A protein has these predicted regions:
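Basic, short loop/linker segments at the boundary and entry of helix-turn-helix/winged-helix-like folds
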Residues: 8-39
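Short, positively charged, Gly/Tyr-enriched micro-motifs
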Residues: 29-97, 189-192, 199, 355
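Mobile genetic element proteins and their domesticated derivatives, centered on retroelements
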Residues: 40, 55, 78, 120, ...
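Active-site- or DNA-interface-adjacent structural scaffold in DNA-acting proteins
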Residues: 72-132
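An anionic, glycine-rich sequence signature occurring as long contiguous blocks
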Residues: 211-315
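A C-terminal functional module that forms or caps the active site or interfaces directly
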Residues: 279-359
């Protein structure tokens, strides 16, 4: 099958971006080009390969196709070579070429719309080993991910030792990010003074959960939103209120959002940089059997009074779980990967997250599940791979026409 240059222009662009990666291997001993390695791993992951052995098998099986746009000097590497070379790549550089590629194919139709960056940790359970007679204990790979609602992709990540290390990792990650016109969200574990200060220092906003780990502050906010206060807000005499309702065959779920700018009553307000509002979300579940369950979550924020922006930030926070972490487990079988080289696994996960974004773009046209799209590619690699990159090129072309 002859490939037209225009059909794989986005694929060649991806290769060109990969050629920008620094190669830390010893010169004179390099057999395989680093960009060949990266592009093959990307295409293999798109084609339903999750493990290093599967990636090497893909390269051998599809060698004739790959040679149409890659050099493949030195032949086809082994699974161990793929793992080793990927482990040597600078993770930030790798992530940057992927974010730049996605930005090229996505049209931001409202530059004034605030992006929501959700920070959350994920554990890859297959990457650990218990201590044995001849085996040292190896801990799980823990990663702090930053998910962009606007780009619908993970735009940054940091390897951490334990889940609790998210707290200290967040300021370091924030230093790398442009937070202009951005709202940062995270769960209550990470609601710390240093973290909100880091957001404000980079020009961003925050809307973050508050729980008992903040002691008196949590109790004070909880006491403020008593039943009388909620009635005042609902009646429009203070703050803002919004109600939404969802129905399914088992229950009716009601969400009530309360936000107020009255925060000067709190004596330590200056300790929380940029604090301008506090809020509450009350979720009520009315089940079909007549039982009712109610829960309340409390929030602090640098946002001015705007219940639509406030409620949207809270809802969109869960995208990091639903659209990223769940897909990494369900579609890419992350917990099944037993790679012990943490850097190799970390970089492979960066590649998988990039592939997830590509597949989500393709899904808009294919109208199939991500798993089915990957299966389709694996059954007819050349045809389906070309089709995917043609679609990405078409998205790119439509962006150019819209921007004129």
């Amino acid at each position: 099958m002859k490939i037209k240059e225009i059909e794989i222009s986005k694929l060649k662009e991806l290769k060109e971006k990969s050629m920008m990666l620094k190669d830390e291997r010893q010169k004179g001993k390099v057999i395989y080009k680093i960009w060949d390695i990266v592009v093959v791993v990307i295409l293999a992951v798109l084609a339903d390969c999750n493990e290093w052995e599967e990636i090497a098998d893909y390269a051998r099986d599809e060698k004739d196709f790959l040679k149409k746009f890659l050099k493949l000097t030195g032949g086809i590497p082994t699974a161990k070579t793929y793992e080793r070379v990927i482990s040597l790549i600078d993770s930030q550089e790798l992530n940057k070429i992927f974010v730049d590629f996605i930005k090229d194919i996505q049209f931001m139709d409202d530059i004034y719309f605030k992006d929501i960056l959700s920070f959350d940790g994920k554990v890859d359970k297959g990457s650990s080993r218990k201590k044995g007679y001849i085996v040292e204990e190896t801990k799980h790979l823990n990663v702090l991910n930053v998910y962009s609602d606007k780009l619908q992709m993970c735009i940054d990540q940091e390897m951490i030792e334990e889940k609790t290390n998210e707290i200290t990792a967040i300021p370091d990650v924030i230093k790398r990010l442009d937070l202009t016109n951005v709202i940062c969200t995270w769960d209550a574990l990470n609601t710390q003074k240093d973290n909100v200060k880091a957001v404000i220092s980079k020009g961003g906003d925050y809307c973050v959960a508050l729980k008992a780990n903040q002691g008196n502050f949590y109790k004070d906010v909880q006491d403020y939103f008593d039943e009388d206060r909620l009635l005042i807000i609902e009646s429009g005499y203070e703050g803002a209120y919004q109600l939404t309702r969802e129905k399914n065959h088992e229950a009716v779920i009601t969400y009530e959002y309360y936000q107020t700018e009255k925060v000067n009553w709190y004596p330590d307000i200056k300790l929380w940089e940029g604090l301008k509002s506090i809020g509450l979300v009350k979720r009520t579940i009315d089940q079909s059997d007549g039982t009712r369950v109610e829960e309340k979550r409390y929030y602090i924020s640098s946002l001015l009074l705007d219940i639509s922006v406030f409620s949207n930030a809270i809802r969109k926070h869960w995208n990091v779980e639903n659209k990223l972490h769940w897909q990494m487990d369900f579609t890419f079988k992350s917990d099944d990967n037993t790679t012990m080289n943490k850097k190799a696994l970390f970089n492979l996960q960066i590649i998988k997250k990039f592939c997830l974004t590509i597949l989500n773009e393709v899904k808009k046209e294919k109208n199939k599940s991500l798993k089915r799209i990957r299966k389709d590619i694996s059954r007819n690699v050349e045809k389906e791979t070309i089709e995917i990159f043609k679609l990405l090129r078409n998205f790119d072309t439509s962006i150019i026409s819209k921007s004129r």
